[in-house]
Design a protein with these regions (language model features):
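Mid/C-terminal beta-alpha module of Rossmann-like enzyme folds, strongest
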Residues: 239-297, 336-338
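Amphipathic terminal alpha-helices
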Residues: 289, 301-311, 315-341
Length: 341
């Protein structure tokens, strides 16, 4: 089986590639398991060294729109024998608010160009689109349902959320026409991400844990009572792979599926940090409001019902403390403070 991962050099893309390579044969859409022959990682940068060293990994470096542009230099990102595409490449929420044109190019134009490239293939590829809970938003003067269901009407309140919702509809229509097998998956906010902060409005939800564990100060830019819907990196990858594996009958409608989320609050996250790493870590948090971040994050839902995902065997993380401990176990070199057993 030949697989393409856009955004393959990023944190989630690289982790997805490692997981696929480690787990062996993949049962695509319920078919008989096939060994993975090649994973092509498409991104603006090279992936980590361990992936480059794997003979099953190919890389394509460049802007996705340029790589898919018709002509001699185009379509490098998707080979004729591609059977599965994970479309993770995106400009993130904060970037899209700061640069409207960047968001439209990265999240809308590139998604349609990739779907068009898949349309030309004779393989009828499975197309797993990484959407976002940002398709749901609280409009000024209005309220969201207390719990967001799979079929709750999206009301995005950011450019990023709108672009992701349009992407969902494009994937659904290309699937309806039989060009691809569509799998729209709404990712929750992923925490704790290792490495450096990115431009997402939700970046602090990793930074407020990651930086204190490294002995560094971190800013929490929203009130402590803000509710958030989170998923660990591992559970997020599980959801993407399960979407690729499930049969059309088990998947159900072409509309998007919410991944399971742990419902918590920023205060509870800080308290979990204190239980794991003590007051030395908790005291490194600076509660400094940022109106721009508050304006975006406060529109997002804090409680998600993932009925379809649960029917596929996917479950939320048990607790945020468990998420922190997973991060510590997976990133021992990034931890500078003593942690409680």
């Amino acid at each position: 089986m030949n697989i393409v991962i856009t955004g393959g050099a990023g944190f989630l893309g690289a982790r997805l590639a490692r997981t696929l390579l480690a787990q062996g044969p993949l049962a695509l859409a319920g078919a008989a398991p096939q060994p993975i022959s090649r994973i092509t990682l498409v991104d603006r940068a090279q992936p980590p060294a361990d992936l480059l060293a794997d003979s099953r990994v190919a890389t394509v470096v460049g802007d996705l729109n340029d790589l898919l542009r018709p002509g001699p230099s185009g379509t490098m990102a998707i080979a004729a024998d591609t059977q599965l595409v994970f479309h993770l490449a995106a400009a993130v929420s904060g970037e899209c608010e700061a640069d409207f044109d960047l968001g439209m190019r990265s999240n809308l134009d590139a998604t349609r160009a990739l779907l068009e490239a898949c349309r030309t293939l004779k393989t009828g590829p499975t197309f797993v689109f990484a959407s976002s809970l940002a398709v749901f938003g609280k409009a000024p003067g209005q309220s969201l349902p207390e719990v967001i269901e799979d079929n709750t009407l999206p009301t995005p309140q950011s450019s990023y959320g709108i672009q992701k919702f349009i992407g969902e509809q494009l994937v659904a229509d290309y699937a309806r026409k039989g060009f691809v097998r569509g799998r729209n998956v709404r990712l929750m906010t992923v925490s704790v991400r290792p490495g450096k902060p990115n431009g997402a409005a939700s970046s602090f939800l990793s930074g407020m844990i990651r930086e204190p564990l490294a002995g560094q100060r971190a800013v929490c830019p929203v009130p402590a009572d803000v509710a958030v819907a989170l998923s660990s990196p591992g559970r997020t990858i599980d959801g993407l792979i399960r979407a690729a594996e499930t049969t059309d009958a088990d998947w159900g409608p072409l509309t998007a599926m919410n991944l399971p989320a742990l419902r918590t609050s920023v205060r509870e996250m800080a308290e979990a940090l204190g239980r794991v790493a003590g007051s030395a870590a908790a005291n490194l948090l600076d509660w400094t409001p940022d109106p721009a971040i508050i304006r975006v994050v406060s529109t997002w839902p804090g409680a998600i019902a993932a009925t379809r995902a649960r029917a596929l065997g996917l479950l939320p993380d048990a607790s945020f403390e468990a998420i922190i401990r997973d991060y510590i176990r997976e990133n021992p070199d990034a931890i500078r403070l003593p942690v409680q057993p």
